[in-house]
Amino acid sequence: MVALRLIPCLDVAHGRVVKGVNFVNLRDSGDPVELACRYSDEGADELVFLDIRASVENRNTLVDLVSRTAKSVKIPFTVGGGIDSVSSINDLLRAGADKVSLNSSAVRNPDLISKSSREFGNQCIVIAIDAKRKVNKTDEWEVYVKGGRENTGIDVLSWAKKVEELGAGEILLTSMDGDGTQNGYDLHLTESVANIVNIPVIASGGAGCLEDIYDVFNEGRASAALLASLLHDKKLSLREIKTFLLERKLPIRPYE
């Protein structure tokens, strides 16, 4: 059985890790390299590094920061934010990233998914989907881009299926409604996407307690759980989370 993964997320703006609620009201959470090292040492299975201002400011992710961070950790590392070409992907992989995450650029140019998948292998290509529930709808979500600022009107489930067909190797699924709230993952959203694709789904947005993480694996059928606020705020440690999940017989890599 493939091990379920715990993945700390480092949202970076202007060279610092930040975290907000529902994609707004950002607060400083520390230095990205220091946090990356801390989480790696604490037993993280992977890391995700997202430059959340890059697509809004129409610039590429900072290669230097990626390089410094990647050199400091020994675990797989995904980087995203403002990546809009095969050459940009190549630069980031050469700088030390193991995977790249595409979001706004993939919506704008879906061919980028297939081109990059052919060039580098689909194991390197993660498609980030920022999903927001439609007003007065329980089973419908729309895709947002530009750091959650722009509604594309695209149905999340249709888009998830399409990116898989185009060659995505993984989906990073963020519930904008749950982001930073620590009120629990959107289990219905996560399960709905996991049920229609055959690639791993990383659940993001809302983790606030041990039960939330267990539920997103057990009920949401996620392959990985992205963690931010509750780790940055030191509400829980990765050791505590892994111990809890292992006691409940989930296939988690033990803390070493």
UniProtKB/Swiss-Prot annotation:
Principal location: cytoplasm
Active site residues of this protein: 11, 130
Gene encoding the protein: hisF
Family: Belongs to the HisA/HisF family.
Domain of life, per lineage: Bacteria
Stated role: IGPS catalyzes the conversion of PRFAR and glutamine to IGP, AICAR and glutamate. The HisF subunit catalyzes the cyclization activity that produces IGP and AICAR from PRFAR using the ammonia provided by the HisH subunit.
Organism: Prochlorococcus marinus (strain MIT 9312)
Catalyzed chemical reaction(s): 5-[(5-phospho-1-deoxy-D-ribulos-1-ylimino)methylamino]-1-(5-phospho-beta-D-ribosyl)imidazole-4-carboxamide + L-glutamine = D-erythro-1-(imidazol-4-yl)glycerol 3-phosphate + 5-amino-1-(5-phospho-beta-D-ribosyl)imidazole-4-carboxamide + L-glutamate + H(+)
Classification via CDD domains: HisF
BP-aspect Gene Ontology terms: L-histidine biosynthetic process
Protein name: Imidazole glycerol phosphate synthase subunit HisF
InterPro entries: Aldolase_TIM, His_biosynth, HisF, IGPS_HisA/HisF, RibuloseP-bd_barrel
Keyword annotations: Amino-acid biosynthesis, Cytoplasm, Histidine biosynthesis, Lyase
SUPFAM superfamilies for this protein: Ribulose-phoshate binding barrel (SSF51366)
Gene Ontology CC annotation, any one: cytoplasm
Compartments where located: Cytoplasm
First-level EC class: lyase
EC number(s) recorded for this UniProt protein: 4.3.2.10
Annotated GO MF terms: imidazoleglycerol-phosphate synthase activity; lyase activity
Pathway: Amino-acid biosynthesis; L-histidine biosynthesis; L-histidine from 5-phospho-alpha-D-ribose 1-diphosphate: step 5/9
UniProt keyword annotation of Glycosyltransferase present: no
